[in-house]
Amino acid sequence: MSDIGSRYHSDLLGCGFKELPPTNQFSGVGRLYSLPQEYGNGIYWVYSEKDLYDIKIHDFCFHQDSFFYFGIPQGCLGICYYESISGEEILPYRRLTAGCVKSFIGGTEPCKTLIHKNTPVRSVDIEITPSYYEHYLKAKFPNEYINPHEAFSNIALTNRFPEMIQLLRQIKNYKGNGIAAKLFFESKLTEAISLIMEYNKQQSSLPSIKLSKADLLALNNGTAYINDHFNCDLSVDQLCRITCMGRT
């Protein structure tokens, strides 16, 4: 995989972004870009280390509802915290709201996302490549290495990961420069992977809940009813009667 920073630079300029000079709002080791004015206003900050990983900060707002269809490179793994957003992932359908943490898995189906207008998109994300976790990590911990792919996959979308939220906020608020900044970002990347693996370990230890065939059938009936009556006022009591389930 080629240098990540060069790839982002080329892609962003090709989409109409303009590179800006460094400001005291962000660390000077990254590169800063402005969103094309015809789409909205705001900035996009990127820091990368060779072909190993990158860290990105988004802070912009669109003039119109905007639909995005993009793929993540094969093998890349990412995690993102949305401080502010209003939108939906189309397939699979998931609502994106402020305060959620989401993982990204490269090489799967391209992500289809609708971002609503006039709501700031403020997010911080970390992305690692196979060069990082299959070579760098594996060489560093040859006897303890665990492929992080499953751990990233199991996060999906959650608002119950306060440790990761705190870490990504620290990244956003950091404004250092030089080697101190590079060491800071590298340490935070390592910490993030540690948190993801620990989160996965804790989730795996929770007791699993198995649904009976009757419960699955009831849920499918409820889903079908909602799809057929999406433009109607539906009450919780009404859905409880349809699915033969209680409020809890």
Features from the language model and the residues they span:
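N-terminal regulatory/effector-sensing and dimerization cores
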Residues: 28-145
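Basic/polar phosphate-binding segments, predominantly the helix-turn-helix DNA-binding elements
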Residues: 192-202, 221, 225-248
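Short, functionally important structural connectors and interaction interfaces within domains
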Residues: 4, 45-47, 226
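Short Lys/Arg-enriched alpha/beta "domain-start" segment
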Residues: 1-29, 35
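N-terminal positioning helix adjacent to the helix-turn-helix/winged-helix DNA-binding module
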Residues: 163, 211-222
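Alpha-helical bundle regulatory/interaction domains
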Residues: 90-211, 247
